[in-house]
């Protein structure tokens, strides 16, 4: 879990890992030069499975991810962002899938999206098969990065590109590896993905442009000119939509998804976040945390 100025959300993210039904894990929290004293919110959490690393430098997400991959001691490596929430069964279900299908390298899960104030907003479904995940590489991969769990050896073989592409490290890695890897997805909602309430349009466009350049280089090298053209068309359509939303729609007034499935998932989310808040408001010490031996 790379951390940079995580603010108020870091504690809940860490507690959601402590709350996992699968207990044999290690959590590496790598602070990337935070200036907001993010780690202070974890001061009372005494858990031998948690390692906090802070070298005082700001080197970027891709560098920190590669460093944690090298430090990891388990057979499997899981991603987690500093402001998201993992559901209690996330690790258990991902490990079960990976162990039942040894051909899989990385698996992701479906998620709900949540606001800065922890309100459930919408659904982020994950395709189940490798073929559906990778059906349209020119369109990108619907495979939420912070929900990944995969073989540690896979992450070490492919690694994140350095310097990291602007806010699209995950898409670059998937594009570079999908032809010789196998991905899988779990349709169950096992994650809460936090979205910013105010979009940073210049950053969004720069991210899309960066990935377009990566795509075109990849497709041209692979002699897939049509895919390159399709990537350009997708880029144009997405940027047009981004600008339209910025100019016409007041995104802060958007209402949450109210589909039947969302109503059910929102009820589950309310129960989960309330249980995490209950733990968060309790002073944590060795008596509240079950210290399990670290992975070997």
Report the location of each language-model feature:
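Acidic helix N-cap motif at the loop->helix transition within catalytic regions
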Residues: 9-11, 34-44, 85, 89
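A conserved acidic beta->alpha catalytic loop
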Residues: 23, 31-40, 57-59, 81
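Glycine-rich, basic loop-to-helix element that forms the pyrophosphate-binding segment
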Residues: 54-72, 93
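Conserved nucleotide-sugar donor-binding catalytic segment
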Residues: 70, 87, 109, 123, ...
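Short aromatic/hydrophobic "clamp" motif used to bind/position activated sugar donors
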Residues: 77
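Conserved donor NDP-sugar-binding/catalytic core segment of glycosyltransferases
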Residues: 89-121
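Membrane-interface aromatic/basic loop that binds lipid-linked glycans or pyrophosphate carriers
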Residues: 215-296
């Amino acid at each position: 879990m790379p951390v940079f100025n995580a603010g108020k959300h870091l504690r809940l993210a860490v507690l959601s890992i402590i709350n996992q039904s699968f207990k044999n894990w290690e959590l590496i929290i790598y602070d990337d030069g935070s200036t907001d004293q993010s780690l202070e919110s974890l001061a009372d959490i005494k858990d031998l499975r948690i390692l906090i690393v802070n070298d005082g430098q700001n080197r970027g997400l891709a560098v920190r991810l590669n460093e944690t991959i090298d430090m990891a001691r388990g057979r499997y490596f899981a991603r987690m962002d500093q402001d998201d929430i993992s559901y209690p069964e996330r690790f258990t279900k991902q490990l079960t899938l990976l162990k039942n299908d040894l051909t899989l390298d990385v698996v992701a899960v479906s998620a709900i999206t949540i606001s800065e104030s922890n309100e459930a907003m919408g659904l982020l479904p994950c395709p189940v098969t490798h073929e559906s995940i990778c059906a349209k590489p020119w369109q990108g991969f619907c495979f939420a990065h912070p929900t990944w769990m995969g073989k540690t050896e896979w992450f070490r073989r492919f690694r994140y590109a350095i310097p990291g592409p602007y806010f699209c490290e995950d898409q670059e890695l998937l594009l570079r590896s999908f032809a010789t890897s196998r991905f899988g997805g779990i349709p169950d909602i096992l994650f809460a993905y936090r979205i910013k309430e105010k979009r940073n349009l210049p950053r969004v466009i720069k991210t899309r442009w960066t990935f377009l350049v990566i795509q075109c280089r990849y497709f041209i090298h692979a002699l897939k000119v049509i895919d390159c053209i399709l990537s350009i068309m997708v880029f144009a359509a997405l940027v047009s939509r981004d600008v339209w939303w910025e100019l016409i729609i007041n995104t802060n007034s958007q209402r949450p998804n109210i589909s039947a499935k969302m109503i059910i998932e929102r009820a589950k989310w309310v129960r989960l976040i309330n249980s995490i808040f209950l733990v968060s408001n309790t002073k944590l010490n060795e008596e509240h945390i079950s210290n399990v031996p670290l992975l070997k």
